[in-house]
Amino acid sequence: FGFHQQMLNYILSPFFYYQPDPWLTHKWKDEKRNMRKHSISFKGLIRAVLFSQTLIKSALAKRVRCTVLYATETGKSKTLAKKLNTMMNYAFSSKVVCMEDYNFSELEKESLLFVVTSTFGNGDCPGNGESFKKQLLSLNNLRNQVRYSVFGLGSRMYPHFCAF
């Protein structure tokens, strides 16, 4: 019975060889290539910070303005509108506003409009979107072509769901 049982009682245990940071231990062979320490003056640092701040301000000022409007009875549309606003803030200068708090005269100035609304009952408008609905229906035409998107929430159990 010549079974190879050398590994029968072999126990594996983890062991790591930690390498020291090479930038701390490296010795340059050529002294000309030896790294010299760069010192940054406080004045130079402030200039760099101010320059980057002006670049960021100009980039943020050029972003397209976006408004997310919501109307809700239960709060679900408000939650989704806030999530949408968070995502839109990565690319746009975005804000979220309830329909009843929205200044309707700003509609012509909007470049991008997202509407998140639910329907209540058989396709009826939520209470805080009623005034926006009336103003929108009384509007004859918009001089500025507003780009918009509507996300409607409702139940298919009603024959006129999302009719608002």
Swiss-Prot record:
Annotated residues for binding of FMN: 72-74, 76-77, 118-119, 155, 162
Location, primary (coarse class): cytoplasm
Cofactor(s) named in the record: heme b; FAD; FMN; (6R)-L-erythro-5,6,7,8-tetrahydrobiopterin
Gene3D superfamilies: 3.40.50.360, 6.10.250.410
Region annotated Calmodulin-binding, chain positions: 42-62
GO BP terms in the entry: nitric oxide biosynthetic process; peptidyl-cysteine S-nitrosylation
Known EC number: 1.14.13.39
Residue positions binding (6R)-L-erythro-5,6,7,8-tetrahydrobiopterin: 3
GO CC terms: cytosol
Catalytic reaction annotation: 2 L-arginine + 3 NADPH + 4 O2 + H(+) = 2 L-citrulline + 2 nitric oxide + 3 NADP(+) + 4 H2O
Localization per record: Cytoplasm, Cytosol
InterPro entries named in the record: Flavdoxin-like, Flavodoxin/NO_synth, Flavoprotein-like_sf, NOS, NOS_N_sf
Swiss-Prot/TrEMBL induction comment: By lipopolysaccharide (LPS).
GO MF term (any one): FMN binding
PANTHER family: NITRIC OXIDE SYNTHASE (PTHR43410:SF1), NITRIC OXIDE SYNTHASE OXYGENASE (PTHR43410)
Family: Belongs to the NOS family.
Protein name per the record: Nitric oxide synthase, inducible
